[in-house]
Design a protein with these regions (language model features):
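Extracellular beta-rich repeat passengers
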Residues: 1-140
Length: 140
């Protein structure tokens, strides 16, 4: 919450899994998912999350060589300035990415992949996050 930079930033072939999360009002990109550097090329998975965009910039920012599976992520509080910057990166998959907008075409740079749709169904299980200050402050 209010990280002042990217909501979640991966670099240098991070190979983990981010599962069940909430990102609130980052100042930079929501997801800054850089590709591998050098010869080590591993991918990662990001799944089951809710994103409250607010002043965030790109919803999802990937490089041409990023390797990431994105699944079951809900974006809300989107403005006309937000977009998914690249949907043609070979190593990036989109599965059940839901934008709380009327039509996703204005928020995707290029042809909208089948895994990105408009809707209003959150994806994160927020009950394990009830202890956080963001939850106590009523931000989700």
């Amino acid at each position: 919450w209010n990280v002042g930079d990217d909501g979640f930033d991966t670099d240098q072939s991070w190979s983990g899994t981010l599962d069940n999360f909430v990102i609130i009002n980052p100042a930079g990109h929501i997801f800054e998912l850089d590709g591998p550097e050098g010869t080590y090329a591993n991918g990662h998975t990001i799944k089951n999350g809710d994103v409250y965009v607010g002043i965030g910039q790109d919803l999802i920012n990937v490089d041409a060589n990023s390797i990431v599976d994105l699944m079951d992520i809900y974006f809300t509080d989107i403005t006309g300035l937000n977009q998914i910057n690249r949907v043609t990166a070979v190593g990036v998959t989109f599965n059940n990415i839901v934008l709380n907008v009327d039509s996703v075409s204005a928020y995707v740079n290029g042809t909208v992949p089948s895994g990105i749709t408009a809707g209003q169904t959150p994806k994160a299980n927020t009950s394990p996050l009830s202890w956080t200050w963001a939850k106590i402050a009523g931000l989700f």
